[in-house]
């Protein structure tokens, strides 16, 4: 490996100190573009950053993707490289994802021991499910036609460097819902005069819990979570309006649409019974992420050849990934690398104490570089 572990660490810590939210990754993009240009790559900038590296005469092209955005979370860890921006931190490891892909770009630019073209894709705003679509809207795939596309994500609680993937469904979809209730507010001592939306909202919330347990098949893997319940009431004021928000995860479109149908039916029925108005919105930004068979087999072979511990038929993940918008168009594979089982790197994703495990950086670089050499072998080299 041509890039040192210390250089990888420094690069990752620099990203960690200066996190930027989705579609605000201005300085992050500047750093990435400068790094790639310094290594001799052609760089195209738009909503994201794309690096192009060619070697040999083969026209085959593959894409490797990393996400760039941070989260609106106040970091509680006290590392020397902790976030310098109040209320913003890299709590999902995108600092590490960027670093590993940049490390692979340097490694491959130095060796050029492959035949074809590699497109290094640095994507904004993964956390809100909008970044991949924004790059597709800029005609990423027509400008850079690819035969395969890949992405990785770190996974705390799993042995460092342990690789997990599977053919078919790898990540659930995510749908966000809002239920707006409008009744008649009033004095807390005279509930019969008004139409209280808190009691109606509570009844709706309880009924929603029956969708997964009673209406979908056991083992569906779907999750419905109510995450917010807001009203305009006060200590002695019954609310006239309430807002219920939540999150749905599904493993297939059929279940997702059935949850949406039942939610609308429950809200309409309970609201009508209590003579209040209601409105439901149900929006899906993250669709299910599906891994293609051939690309997944290639990732598994790379893990075998590198001597990594791996599981090539892991359980589908309940979280969501907007890499799905790429892999729905180009055959692809998302795989996971363990971030550590204890100590450094084991805290959950999206927690204020989370930190990417620096020991994973060289492993990720090796996986990316080996994947390129496997898919784009030089003449005379074993594929």
Segments from the language model and where they lie:
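Divalent metal-coordination and catalytic microenvironments
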Residues: 15, 64, 94, 120, ...
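Acidic/His- and Gly-rich active-site-bordering loop/insert found
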Residues: 1-90, 102, 106-114
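Non-cysteine beta-strand/loop elements that form the S-adenosyl-L-methionine
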Residues: 63-65, 74, 177, 334-340
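Alpha-helical transmembrane segments that form the membrane-embedded catalytic/substrate-binding core
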Residues: 97-101
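General beta-strand structural signal in soluble alpha/beta enzymes
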Residues: 44-46, 120-122, 150-152, 312, ...
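Metal-dependent amide/peptide-bond hydrolase catalytic core
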Residues: 38, 202-383
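Histidine/acidic-residue-rich, glycine-tolerant segments that coordinate divalent metal ions
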Residues: 49, 71-73, 79-89, 95-96, ...
């Amino acid at each position: 490996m041509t890039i040192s572990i210390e250089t990888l660490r420094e690069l990752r810590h620099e990203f960690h100190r200066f996190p930027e939210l989705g579609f605000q990754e201005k300085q992050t993009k500047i750093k990435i573009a400068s790094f790639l240009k310094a290594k001799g790559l052609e760089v195209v900038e738009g909503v994201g950053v794309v690096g192009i590296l060619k070697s040999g005469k083969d026209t085959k092209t593959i894409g490797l993707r990393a996400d760039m955005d941070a989260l609106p979370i106040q970091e509680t860890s006290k590392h020397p490289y902790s976030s310098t921006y109040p209320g913003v931190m890299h709590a999902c490891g995108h600092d590490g994802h960027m670093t590993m892909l940049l490390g692979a770009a340097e490694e491959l630019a130095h060796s050029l021991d492959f035949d074809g073209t590699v497109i290094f894709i640095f994507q904004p705003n993964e956390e809100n499910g909008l970044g991949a679509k924004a790059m597709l809207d800029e005609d990423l795939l027509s400008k850079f036609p690819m035969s395969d596309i890949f992405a990785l994500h770190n996974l705390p609680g799993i042995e460092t460097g342990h690789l997990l993937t599977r053919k078919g469904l790898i990540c659930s979809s995510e749908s966000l819902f809002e239920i707006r209730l409008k009744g008649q507010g009033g004095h807390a001592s005279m509930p019969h005069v008004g139409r209280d939306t808190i009691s109606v909202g509570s009844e709706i919330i309880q009924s929603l819990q029956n969708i997964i347990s009673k209406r979908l098949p056991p083992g569906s893997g779907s999750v419905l979570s109510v995450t917010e319940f807001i009203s305009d009431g006060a200590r002695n004021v019954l609310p006239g309006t309430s807002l219920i928000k939540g999150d749905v995860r599904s493993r297939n479109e059929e279940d997702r649409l059935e949850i949406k149908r039942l939610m609308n039916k429950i809200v309409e029925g309970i609201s009508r019974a209590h003579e209040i108005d209601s409105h439901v919105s149900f929006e899906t930004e993250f669709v299910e992420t599906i891994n293609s068979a051939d690309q997944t087999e290639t990732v598994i072979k790379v893990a075998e050849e590198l001597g990594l511990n791996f599981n090539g038929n892991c359980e589908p993940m309940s979280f969501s990934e907007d890499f799905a918008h790429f892999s729905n168009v180009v055959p692809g594979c998302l795989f996971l690398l363990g971030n550590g089982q204890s100590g450094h790197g084991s805290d959950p994703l999206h927690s204020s104490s989370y930190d990417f495990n620096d020991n994973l950086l060289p492993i990720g670089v090796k996986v990316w570089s080996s994947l390129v050499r496997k898919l784009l072998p030089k003449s005379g080299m074993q594929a």
